[in-house]
Amino acid sequence: MTDRTDADDLDLQRVGARLAARAQIRDIRLLRTQAAVHRAPKPAQGLTYDLEFEPAVDADPATISAFVVRISCHLRIQNQAADNDVKEGDTKDETQDVATADFEFAALFDYHLQEGEDDPTEEELTAYAATTGRFALYPYIREYVYDLTGRLALPPLTLEILSRPMPVSPGAQWPATRGTP
């Protein structure tokens, strides 16, 4: 679902930690959606999916105590296929798309700074959107995908649980870097 490494994700969590300790979610909205079924699924093959996230943050310097996290999502649902199902000249991507969906959720967060604290930086807000904000919106994204696939006359799709890497104990070495879902 993403190409960030565990180390990158942990670094973002650290940068956004001050905001994560003070922010509360106040409202969630589906801002836009577009979905299409491109071909019928092959029941004998089963389906697989790819979900990409693009987090962003909107913050108005005049409104110091609130910001909006937007998560744009691109979902591709494909037939599971063996390599021999791909015809010469075709790519797997061209032969497998059953449905696609593009949609965007937004969440309004507010926060309260302690006396004497600096306002959140753009880096903190962006890190928060990519970590805690994404985590906060994921259950809504997950439920929406389940509902959407049923409405498109596809088997309801239950997305995997969104996971975070485990923090490393002080003095311990980082495990081998790998991509995370």
UniProtKB/Swiss-Prot annotation:
SUPFAM superfamilies: SecB-like. The keyword Chaperone applies. Induction: Operon autorepressed by HigA1. InterPro entries: SecB-like_sf (IPR035958). Keywords: Chaperone. Belongs to the SecB-like family. Homotetramer, interacts with antitoxin HigA1. Chaperone component of an atypical, type II toxin-antitoxin chaperone (TAC) module, probably required for antitoxin HigA1 to neutralize its cognate toxin HigB1. This is SecB-like chaperone MT2006. It comes from Mycobacterium tuberculosis (strain CDC 1551 / Oshkosh).
